[in-house]
């Protein structure tokens, strides 16, 4: 009986083994079949509009980086294409095609992209089809520029033009955060920047051009830049075309952008008790005694340690303890974490059979990141900020079938405010560039002044009137004094650009393709500076840990009231340009030619005037 049971069990085990093997083969076979059905291999050949093989065409699975390219004979093989995926065939100058599913072999015929072939770029005195340009030219579309939150066009170009190096200076403060541009490296001829032209007129810079006014930007980077601009174009040319109106109903566009700016990286904070512990550790490593006792470190952690709340002069003791055992974060004391920036824009465009129009009004407010005292307390405002109002009106007139005229008017009014720091850094008080050294000084001092240092102003509990500046004997000047107590610097700029041009098509009068173009532009630039300078006495602070007290000693006794100075300057420029143009197609041949002349007249020296006077309150000051 026992032997029979063993035989039955053995048979059952054999049956289980066979069943398991069959099931495993079924699963593997099903998985293999499923894998075979979930991906496929596709092949094909790509031809152009003339049925010629196209090498170098990209075939890629949409949403992935997996793809291949056609060989010299236009054929391709793409393996492991997931079921249900989209395969795209693309080539520069041709319209993209999507391969339909359900096939494994394709014959693809690409169609030229007519829009790309007709795309034009601005070149010197006119426009040219992009496909026919042989020089090194980069273009930037207006839609790309309007995506940025930058308030300056020169900063917005950074990273959007190949070979363009943009180096920002001025400390990054509002109104003085300009960028110096170089094409193909900073080692340009005499270290000069590219020549800048807006609608064909030479400009000193493009920082005030509203990005909502720009239609396109072309950057000439090789010999094509010197063909018509000579040595001025040796470092490249940046050509900016502003927007024009199109025939049709009026289109109104309103936009508002609110953003906040901040430093990309900020230093970590060191607390006062952490400094004391690290200082003791450093002295211990040198075999020296500790500078701060455990009691002092404990009081830095809790300034109210050991005080009796029932004491009659408890409030006074609290004030004194907090002044002695301070934990100052000078970086945050001098600099804000976030700064607001606002931008509003309104434009309208349209046209009729006689005139096309584009009108744009823009406003920008850029706040500063300095933590300054209240203007009501100081009597003036040393904060960094910029306000700019800009206007552009482009009108195009169709006088006759062959004669057109354009009138472009652009203007801006800008107000830039900042602390009066020019004289502190050995520069011209009227110069804005010294702001760069101010920011460098602030960041340096915020990391140099110890968190246990009292300040930034005196306290009346220790024998000196409150509110006086505290200096530190290991620094040349106090950062608090720089941004608050030295005065203010206001720069007001106004600019007006007027441009009139005519274009006469002589195709019917003389010969087909011949035209004459003339243009005159008159620019005026006015600048007014109002600066208030003052000086206050400063003190040193000494901490007495034995008595939990502070003492002040006079450092600089020199004082002077707020002294006002103003500068005014103005200059103008007259720009005249004319050209004869010829463009005609003979069969498959395009013939173009141009003869041009230009003249620039102006007064670059301007008119400067200086006035000095003293003012008691220095409140609500306008130029």
Q: Predicted regions span which residues?
A:
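Conserved short loop/turn motifs at secondary-structure junctions
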Residues: 141-145, 409-413, 520
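Secondary-structure transition into beta-strands, especially the periplasmic turns and strand N-termini
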Residues: 164, 245-252, 348-357, 397-407, ...
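Small-side-chain secondary-structure face that scaffolds active or pore-lining regions
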Residues: 364-388, 418-420, 425, 487, ...
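Extended, hydrophobic alpha-helical segments in both membrane/secreted and soluble proteins
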Residues: 197, 214, 391, 518, ...
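Surface-exposed loop/turn segments flanking beta-strands in extracellular/periplasmic regions
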Residues: 275-288, 295, 299-326, 426-478, ...
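Flexible loop and strand-edge segments within Gram-negative outer membrane beta-barrel domains
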Residues: 263-266, 322-362, 366-370, 382-476, ...
């Amino acid at each position: 009986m026992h032997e029979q049971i063993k035989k039955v069990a053995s048979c059952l085990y054999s049956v289980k083994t066979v069943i398991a093997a069959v099931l495993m083969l079924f699963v593997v076979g099903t998985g293999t079949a499923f894998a075979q059905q979930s991906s496929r291999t596709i092949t094909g050949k790509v031809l152009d509009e003339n049925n010629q093989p196209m090498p170098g065409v990209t075939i890629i699975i949409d949403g992935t980086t997996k793809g291949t390219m056609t060989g010299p004979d236009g054929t391709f093989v793409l393996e492991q294409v997931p079921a249900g995926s989209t395969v795209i065939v693309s080539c520069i100058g041709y319209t993209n095609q999507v391969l339909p599913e359900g096939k494994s072999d394709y014959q693809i015929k690409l169609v030229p992209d007519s829009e790309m072939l007709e795309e034009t770029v601005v070149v010197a005195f006119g426009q040219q089809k992009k496909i026919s340009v042989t020089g090194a030219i980069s273009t930037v579309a207006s839609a790309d520029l309007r995506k940025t939150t930058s308030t300056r066009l020169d900063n917005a170009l950074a990273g959007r033009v190949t070979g363009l190096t943009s180096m920002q200076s001025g400390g990054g403060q509002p109104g003085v955060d300009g960028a110096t541009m170089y094409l193909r490296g900073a080692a340009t001829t005499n270290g000069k920047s590219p020549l800048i032209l807006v609608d064909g007129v030479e400009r000193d810079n493009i920082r005030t051009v509203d990005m909502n006014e720009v239609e396109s930007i072309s950057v000439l980077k090789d010999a094509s830049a010197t063909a018509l601009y000579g040595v001025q174009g040796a470092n490249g040319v940046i050509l900016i075309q502003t927007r024009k109106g199109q025939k049709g109903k009026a289109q109104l566009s309103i936009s508002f952008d609110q953003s906040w700016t901040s430093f990309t990286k900020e230093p970590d904070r060191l607390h006062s008790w952490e400094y004391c512990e690290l200082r003791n550790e450093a002295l211990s490593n040198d075999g020296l005694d500790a500078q701060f006792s455990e009691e002092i470190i404990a009081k830095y952690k809790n300034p109210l340690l050991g005080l009796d709340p029932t004491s009659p002069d408890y409030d006074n003791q609290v004030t004194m303890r907090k002044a002695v055992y301070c934990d100052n974060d000078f970086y945050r004391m001098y600099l804000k974490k976030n700064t607001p920036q606002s931008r509003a824009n309104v434009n309208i465009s349209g046209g009729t059979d006689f005139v096309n129009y584009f009108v744009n009004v823009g406003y920008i407010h850029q706040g500063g990141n300095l933590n300054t005292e209240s203007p009501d307390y100081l009597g003036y405002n040393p904060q960094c900020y910029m306000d700019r109002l800009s206007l552009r009106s482009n009108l195009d007139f169709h006088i006759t079938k062959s004669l057109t005229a354009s009138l472009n008017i652009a203007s801006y009014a800008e107000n830039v405010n900042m602390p009066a720091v020019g004289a502190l850094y050995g520069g011209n008080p009227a110069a804005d560039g010294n702001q760069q050294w101010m920011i460098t000084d602030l960041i340096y001092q915020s990391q140099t002044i110890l968190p246990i240092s009292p300040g930034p102003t005196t306290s009346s509990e220790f024998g000196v009137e409150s509110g006086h500046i505290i200096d530190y004997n290991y620094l040349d000047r106090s950062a608090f004094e720089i941004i608050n107590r030295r005065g203010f610097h206001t720069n007001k700029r106004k600019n007006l650009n007027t441009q009139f041009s005519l274009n006469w098509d002589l195709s019917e009068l003389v010969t087909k393709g011949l035209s004459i173009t003339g243009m005159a532009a008159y620019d005026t630039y006015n600048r007014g500076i109002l600066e208030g300078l003052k000086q206050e006495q400063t003190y040193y602070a000494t901490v007495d840990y034995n008595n939990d007290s502070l003492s002040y000693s006079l450092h600089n006794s020199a004082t002077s009231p707020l002294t006002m100075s103003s500068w005014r300057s103005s200059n103008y420029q007259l720009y005249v340009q004319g050209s004869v143009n010829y463009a005609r197609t003979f069969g498959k041949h395009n013939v173009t030619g141009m003869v041009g002349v230009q003249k620039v007249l102006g007064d670059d020296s301007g008119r400067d005037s200086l006035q000095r006077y003293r003012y008691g309150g220095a409140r609500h000051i306008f130029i």
